[in-house]
Amino acid sequence: ARAAADSDLILIEGVMGLFDGQPSAADIAERFGIPVMALIDAGAMAQTFGAVAHGLATYRPGLPFAGVLANRVGSERHAAMARDSLPAGMGWFGALPRNPDAVLPERHLGLLQAAEIDDIETRLDSLADALAASAVVDLPEPVEFDDVPPPSIAPLLAGRRVAIARDAAYGFIYPANLETLRSLGAELRFFSPVAGDALPECDAVWLPGGYPELHAAALSANQALWAALRAHVAAGKPLLAECGGMMSLFEKVTDKAGETHAFAGLLPGISVMQKRLAALGMQFADLPEGRLQGHTFHYSKSETRLQPLVRAQTQDGREGEAIYRQERLTASYVHFYFASNPAATAALFG
C-alpha cells in the first residue's frame, strides 16, 4: 500500500512458475487481488500457446488472471498465431520478438545488474517499441490496497552507526532493510570494499550478499579492511554477514574458474563456487535475539570446522542453512528480512 501511494504502476515479478513455491506468485496475487500477466515463452510453439495460457488461467479458480504476453516470437505471423489461439476474452498484452541484441545478459544468480550493462537503455527501448506495436489490451483496473499505517518501531538503535558494504560485490540489499534500520534510529554509513574504502567509524557492520567471487582480486587486496573488521569483532562489536558477505569472511574463496583467493580469515574455512544451484527458498531462523524471516539463493558451498549456533528452517519444516556465531559476529547464507522482526534486528546490531 505504501508503494502504491506514490506510483502509477507496480510490476511485481514472480519467482519460478506461477504456482511454484510456498507462498507462490499465485498465492500473493489471490491474497491481494493483483491481476496476473503470464509471460509465456512462445519460441517453440504456436497453437499450443493458447492451451498453456488456458491452463494457467483456469488451474486455480478465483485467480485474477488478466492475460498473457508472448516472449521470443519469430515473426509477426508467429505472434498472430499465438494470439489467435487464446480463449475468447483473454487479454493479449503483446509479443516480444526473438532478438539476440535485446537479450539481457545473466550469470548464476540472475540478470546482470543494470549498472553493469552499458547499453541497457537501448535494449529496453527496443523491447518497449515491440510491446507498443503489438499490445491490444488496456491495463487492468487499479487495485485498491488497504491503507495500512507503517508499524511503530521504537528507536532501539538511536545513536548507533551501522556501516554497510554497498557496491558491485555487495549489492543484495532489500530497501525495506535500510528503511527498518533508519526507523530504528540507526545512522547508515555506506562504503565500497571493491573500491578499497576503509571501514567507516561505526558501532556495527553489515556485509550483505552479492558477488564477492567476481571481484576476488580487488577484495583480496583490501587487507586493511579485513584487518579493521578483525579489530571490530575483537572489540566486541556486532557484524552481520549474509551469503556473499559470509563468504568473504572465510579464509579463502574459490571462484568458478577454480582459482582460490585469500579473504578476510575471520571464519575458519573456505567457500567454493559450484556449477549447480546449492539452495533456494524462504527460510526462518530462531536466533537468541528472536525469529527472523529470510531467503536463501546461492551457488557456493562452504566448508568450516565451526559448529552452527542454530540452523534455519524451511517453510515446510526441513533443516535449512547454518547460522554461525563468534562473539558478536553472525554469519549465514540467509538474507534476513529485517522488517520481519525489528526488535531482533536491533539486538543483532545493538
Language model features: what each stretch is:
Residues 26-27, 53-55, 83-87, 177-183, ...:
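Short, solvent-exposed amphipathic alpha-helical segments in soluble enzyme
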Residues 46-154:
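Internal gly/pro-rich beta-alpha loop/helix module
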Residues 212-286:
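Cysteine-nucleophile active-site neighborhood
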Residues 11-13, 37-39, 41-42, 69, 71-74, 163, 165-169, 334, ...:
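Structural motif
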Residues 156-158, 170-180, 184-188, 272-276, ...:
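C-terminal and late-domain segments of enzyme folds
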Residues 160-234:
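Phosphate-binding active sites in nucleotide-utilizing proteins
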Residues 1-32, 40-63, 76-80:
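ATP-dependent carboxylate-amine ligase catalytic core
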